[in-house]
Amino acid sequence: MYKLIIHGGISLNGSVITAGSKNSSLPILFASILANGPITLTNTPHLSDVSTTLRLLMDMGAEFILESDNSLFINGSKLTNLVAQYNLVKTMRASILALGPMLAKYGKAKISLPGGCAIGPRPVNLHLEALENLGATIKVKNGYIYATAKELIGTKIHFKQISVTATENIIMAATLATGITTIYNAAQEPEIVDLVKCLIKMGAIISGAGTSIIIIQGVDELSGVTYSVCPDRIEAGTYLVATAITGGKITIKNVHYQSMHAILEKLLETGADIKTNKNSIILDMKGKRPRAVNIKTSTYPNFPTDMQAQFTALNAIADGYSTITETIFENRFMHIPELSRMGANLVLKGNTVVCKGVKYLTGMPLIATDLRASASLVLAGLVATGTTTIERVYHLDRGYETIEEKLKLLGAQIERVQD
C-alpha cells in the first residue's frame, strides 16, 4: 500500500497536460464488445479503473495491447465468457456498462452487481427496467444480474431520473436493436457525446447526444475504428482548483474548456483571472486568497458532483462564508471529517455543508475514502502548513494519472512512498 506525503504552503505554477477522460474511456472500452473488429483508442488514461476494465474484458475473451504513449488496441469482438465476475467488478461501478453491449451482441449476460466508491447508493434499477423495456428478461439472484434477450426491440425509454451510466448502457444496447429507440430525460454529459461520436464512427445511427432526447436507429453490425478519447474535464478542474487554492498560476493543456463552463464560472467567482484558448486554460490567482463561493451540484451542464469535494477544500481556506449542497449522491461528504481535523470550519446539515473559511489548515495524517474525496485531501495538503500524509491513495489512482508527478511539475513538494 502506498501513501502520499505532502509538504504544504507552496504556490503552484507551471503547466500540465490533461489526460484522456476516465468517464469517457470506460464506456468506450465496453463499446468494443459491440464491434466486429478491433478498436484503437488514443489518449487513453493510465488509471486503475481502465486496468480493471481491461482485465474484465480479457477475462471475457477480449485481447488488448496498452502502449506507453497512451494508445490502446483492443479486440472485444469475440467474447468466449459472458460472465463478469465479482472479484473483477467489486471495485468499479462502471462494470454495469458491460450489460447492454453483451445483451445486444450475444443475447445474454451474467454480471455481478457493481462496486466502486462508497458514496451512497447508485441503484441499477434504471438500467434493468430500460433493458426490460427493450425486450430483455432479467433476474437478480445471489448478487448477480442474469439477463437474456432473443432480440432487443427499439422502444421509447423514459428515465425517471437522469443517470449517466444508464443513458450510456441503453445507447449501446440500442445500437444493435431492431428499430428505433428514443431515450427521454437522457443525461447530457460531454462523455456521453464522446461515446456517441465513437459509436457513430463505428457505424451506429444516433442523434441528439448532448440533449435530453437521444434517438438511436438500430443497425446490423458495428465496425472497429480508431478513436481519440476526449480530455478529462474533472482532472483539469482539479488542477485549476489546486492552483487557485495555493495562489498560483497554471496553464492546462489538452482541454475542452467549452465543457467546463460551470467550473470556470465558480473559479472566476473566487477571484481568479482566467483565459481560454482553443485547447488550453490559463488561470492566475496572483497570490490572492480565494473568495468563498456557494456550490450546488446538479446534472450537466450545471456544476458537477465530481468537483464538489475539491471546491469544499477551496472554501475551507477561502475568505467568507459558503454553502456546498450535494444533490446527486448521498453520503458524498466523507472528506468533511478529515478537513475538519486539519482546522476547517465545516458544519454538515443534511445534504449541505456550511463553511466559514479559515486562514490556515494544518497538515496531519489523513485517510482517503473515495476518489474525489481523496483529491480534496491532496488539495488541502498542498495549502496546509506542515506535512500531510494521505493513506489509501489507490482511490486516487482510479481517476488521476500520476497525480503526484503532475503536481511536482507545478512545484509541489509531494512524494509517493510505500508503507
Curated annotation (Swiss-Prot):
Family annotation (SUPFAM superfamilies): EPT/RTPC-like
Keyword tRNA processing among record annotations: no
Entry-annotated residues carrying 2-(S-cysteinyl)pyruvic acid O-phosphothioketal: C117
Major localization listed first in the record, in broad terms: cytoplasm
HAMAP family for this protein: MurA (MF_00111)
Reaction(s) catalysed by this chain's protein: phosphoenolpyruvate + UDP-N-acetyl-alpha-D-glucosamine = UDP-N-acetyl-3-O-(1-carboxyvinyl)-alpha-D-glucosamine + phosphate
Encoding gene per record: murA
Gene Ontology molecular functions: UDP-N-acetylglucosamine 1-carboxyvinyltransferase activity
Keywords: Cell cycle, Cell division, Cell shape, Cell wall biogenesis/degradation, Cytoplasm, Peptidoglycan synthesis, Pyruvate, Transferase
GO terms of biological process kind: cell division; cell wall organization; peptidoglycan biosynthetic process; regulation of cell shape; UDP-N-acetylgalactosamine biosynthetic process
EC numbers, comma separated: 2.5.1.7
NCBIfam families: murA, PRK09369.1
Enzyme class: transferase
Family: Belongs to the EPSP synthase family. MurA subfamily.
Stated name of the protein: UDP-N-acetylglucosamine 1-carboxyvinyltransferase
Pathway(s): Cell wall biogenesis; peptidoglycan biosynthesis
Subcellular locations according to the entry: Cytoplasm
A GO cellular component annotation in the UniProt record: cytoplasm
Protein purpose: Cell wall formation. Adds enolpyruvyl to UDP-N-acetylglucosamine.
Record has Ligase as a keyword: no
InterPro entries: Enolpyruvate_Tfrase_dom (IPR001986), Enolpyruvate_Tfrase_sf (IPR036968), MurA_subfamily (IPR050068), RNA3'P_cycl/enolpyr_Trfase_a/b (IPR013792), UDP_GlcNAc_COvinyl_MurA (IPR005750)
List of residues binding phosphoenolpyruvate: K22, N23
Protein residues bound to UDP-N-acetyl-alpha-D-glucosamine: R93, D306, I328
Any single Pfam family the record assigns to this protein: EPSP_synthase
